Every structure is written in C-alpha cells, then in structure tokens.
Amino acid sequence: MRIEIWSDVVCPWCYIGKRRLERALGQFEHAADVEVTWRSFQLNPDTPPGTAVPTLDYLARRFGPQATAMTTQVAELARAEGLDFDFGAALTVNTLDAHRLLHLAADAGVGGAAKERLLRAHFTEGADLSDQDTLTRLLTEAGADEPRVRAVLASDEYADAVRADFDEARMLGANGVPFFVIDRTYGVSGAQSAETFLHALRTAYAAEDAAEDAGAR
C-alpha cells in the first residue's frame, strides 16, 4: 500500500496531519505494508527567493486581526499532537529549494527523516528554510550527503520533479494541503483525525484484498 502526501514544510496543518497519520499507522494492522511518499506543494510560490518574512507579520497582512486567534488555535491543536509550535519565531519563505532537497533525500532513502527535520526546524526552531547553509545543515542531520546537498543547491536539479508534483496535485484536484492519496484510489484532504485516517487505511486495504481475491479466481 502506498500513501502519497502533498504538503509544504511551512504548512502547520501539514505537520499536524503528519502526526495524526502516524497515530493511525500505529493502530493499523498492516502498517508494515505501507510505503509513504512525500510530494511537493508550495503555499507561497510567489515569495521572492531569499526573502524571509516573520510569519506573524505575513499572516497579519493576509488575515488582519483574525491572525492571532488563528495561530493560537493551531498551536493548541499542535500541542495535542505533541508539537510545540513557535509562530513568533517562524519565517515565511519560498520553499522551492527545500522541496528540491526533499526529492534528493527521497532518492537517498532518508526522505521521511528529512521531511520531519525541516518541519521541526521551521515550526519549533525558527529556521530560515530558504537559507542554503541552514538547509545543508538540516539535510545532513537527516542523513543526506553534504557534498551532494551542496551540489543540488548550486544547480536546478530536481526542479522539474517539484514542478511535476505541483502539476499532479492540480490534476488530482488538490487545491490545498495536506492532501493524502492512498493507492491512487482514496483521497483524504486536510489534517483529518487519526480515526478518519485509520478508517481510510482499512477501507483501502480491504478493497485491495478484494481485488486480489477476484483476480485470483
């Protein structure tokens, strides 16, 4: 069973949804058969590269007085999942380079570790995920090869793969993230509850089993 997840590393709901999916997988009887693949999606593709805007300022400009209540609510929901969000330190940036490096990490077999490291760095450490030295450090901590990381950052390698993920998200009807697709058949949009994810996993697995049984007859 394959779960593809479209998300951005500066998306709070994506981190919350990741934790809820992980809780569901902890209860799923066939979790050992599940492969998770991370896909790219940018919330702020028009942010100029190299520009880091305090997230609270960015949200205040976009949502006005509601921004404070929004971040307070999201931080509370994150705490329920064991996450300590620090919106006061977070920076809104262009995440294209981060996504290119996540493709590199996936090819190196450390995609999951890299995704978690970048999310944690953004939401709890106030890291600038557009800064190449910061990205190099974080990817290396996740297990990627430092010279390879620097080589990718010095080129446009994996940019086509990132754009292909964007195009595929649109084709699948995803206009927001997180967006989860199970076996290219079942879609789950948003940071749903662990119970919702578990139901989707069991439904998809049962359907796959039934299809295999029918094909064996």
Where are these regions (language model features)?
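A broad, low-specificity signal for short, low-complexity segments enriched in glycine/proline
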Residues: 1, 46-49, 61-65, 138-142, ...
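Short cysteine clusters
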Residues: 11-14
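Structural alpha/beta surface segment adjacent to cysteine/selenocysteine redox centers
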Residues: 19-122, 217
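Short strand-loop junctions, especially beta-strand C-caps/beta-turns
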Residues: 8, 88-90, 185
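C-terminal cap of thioredoxin/glutaredoxin-like
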Residues: 3-6, 16-30, 103, 107-217
